[in-house]
């Protein structure tokens, strides 16, 4: 059973809104600012708001990057949110920094020829692609709140858990591999549907966190 959750603070995350969301689920989060803080945690949350390059610089300054890579490669659970999803990939159109590289693929700027405003702000429905413990195909209310200008393009289709419409095309909404998952949207700002998703993540953790291939 996994009971101790860590929220990574590297200076570019929407920490308070995530904390409030988990407080509603009666779950306290331990703030992680340095490697020593990881000893108190069984699972991690990597939030993020802002640009890719500054985020990686801030994350490097915490000295957490090697530990985060070891954490995920060791099969321990981590959930990324918004920019936190993008940082899991190898690189981004938004800058020249190297991402964490925990998922293969590149983050691209949203296309300007789709008749949609950029940044993409608002609600969109999820369409399931591959198995993910955060998703419930029987849940009719799967609209989530997005705020972003970039979207990840996974190299491996098996890592793509859900997509969402953007103009005439679709974008990556969720990824999942093993015990590593992430949302491009903000579940903590997605009302009841987002709360149900976070509750499913907690239930998955508390029942053994079985990895998804």
Swiss-Prot record:
Reaction equation(s) it catalyzes: 5-[(5-phospho-1-deoxy-D-ribulos-1-ylimino)methylamino]-1-(5-phospho-beta-D-ribosyl)imidazole-4-carboxamide + L-glutamine = D-erythro-1-(imidazol-4-yl)glycerol 3-phosphate + 5-amino-1-(5-phospho-beta-D-ribosyl)imidazole-4-carboxamide + L-glutamate + H(+); L-glutamine + H2O = L-glutamate + NH4(+)
GO CC annotations, alphabetized: cytoplasm
GO molecular function, one term: glutaminase activity
Compartments (UniProt record): Cytoplasm
EC number: 4.3.2.10, 3.5.1.2
Subunit-level organization: Heterodimer of HisH and HisF.
Protein name, UniProt field: Imidazole glycerol phosphate synthase subunit HisH 2
Species, as recorded: Prochlorococcus marinus (strain MIT 9313)
Lineage: Bacteria, Bacillati, Cyanobacteriota, Cyanophyceae, Synechococcales
